[in-house]
Every structure is written in C-alpha cells, then in structure tokens.
C-alpha cells in the first residue's frame, strides 16, 4: 500500500533524512540546485506551509520510505512535477510515477502535467516516455515534457 506524507507534517528524523537524500550525489546531480545547507532546508520546509503553489510528499510503500514526489507551479490548468527515489533503491520509479499521475489528475485536477528533464538523465526520460509523456520543447540543458489528462484517460489503469 502506498501512502503520501506531506512535507509540512514531517517529523525530525524525516526532515533530516530528506536533507541527506537531497544532497546525495545520485540525487543532486539531476537537480538545478546542487547543494543546500540544513538552515536553507528548514527555511524551505517552513515556506511550504504558506505556499499553495507547491506540494512535496514523502512516499511510503508498506511503511518503508521509498522516495519523494513534488508538484510546483500549481495552477488550475497545470503543474510541474519532480521525483527522486531513496538512494540505492532500485525499481521504484514507476511506483513514484503512478502516484504523481494519480495525484495530479485526481487531487490537483490539473489538465496538464509538466516537467523539465536534464538531457543527460536518460533513465528519467525513458520512464516519462513509457508513461506517455511527450517532449514539447527543449533548451540547452533540458527537455520540456508534458502529459495531458485527456491522453491519460485512454491508458490502461
């Protein structure tokens, strides 16, 4: 069973765990901000209480923490998402992706789900394309991808 825990409800151990993951080289190599200090991390978590355009979740599978999913720039029409798995944990990308798609379309009720993917993050791009995301633009560093809810309704659940 999958459970989402909002970052605004994390306990002290979870706050520290997320901080360590966020600065782990396997994770931050594909982040725009490469390193954050603990004070910055705490400020970020505090700001989430007042910012309705962002939602971050710790993802549990059968009581085990498996990763993080997030939604930013949330509007009535669209949002951007991000995800990362627990360092050294393999095979959970699709589980995290399923939760992103479900939460965005069922809870946030957006029409379009978007992300920016580092061009050298082939693993992530493959996962997104397997989930019917399409590249709609690109720049020097990123592919811009999206999935429309109308495309998703035709997919098997």
From Swiss-Prot:
Its EC number is 2.3.1.-. Keywords: Acyltransferase, Transferase. One of its GO terms (molecular function) is acyltransferase activity, transferring groups other than amino-acyl groups. It is an enzyme of class 2 (transferase). Pfam families: Acetyltransf_3. It comes from the Bacteria. Coiled coil: none annotated. InterPro entries: Acyl_CoA_acyltransferase (IPR016181), GNAT_dom (IPR000182), PseH (IPR020036). PANTHER family: GNAT-FAMILY ACETYLTRANSFERASE (PTHR43415:SF3), SPERMIDINE N(1)-ACETYLTRANSFERASE (PTHR43415). This is Acetyltransferase PseH. It comes from Campylobacter jejuni subsp. jejuni serotype O:23/36 (strain 81-176).
């Amino acid at each position: 069973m999958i459970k989402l825990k909002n970052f605004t409800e994390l306990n002290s151990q979870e706050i520290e765990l997320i901080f360590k993951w966020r600065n782990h080289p396997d994770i931050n190599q594909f982040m725009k901000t490469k390193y954050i200090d603990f004070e910055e991390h705490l400020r970020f978590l505090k700001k989430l209480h007042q910012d309705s355009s962002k939602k971050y979740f710790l993802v549990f599978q059968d009581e085990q923490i498996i990763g993080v999913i997030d939604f930013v720039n949330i509007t009535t029409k669209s949002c951007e998402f991000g995800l990362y798995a627990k360092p050294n944990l393999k095979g959970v990308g699709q589980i995290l992706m399923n939760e992103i798609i479900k939460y965005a379309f069922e809870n946030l009720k957006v029409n379009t789900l978007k992300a920016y993917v580092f061009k050298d993050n082939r693993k992530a791009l493959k996962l997104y394309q397997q989930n019917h995301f399409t590249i709609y633009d690109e720049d020097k560093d990123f592919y811009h991808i999206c999935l429309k809810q109308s495309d998703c309704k035709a997919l098997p659940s």
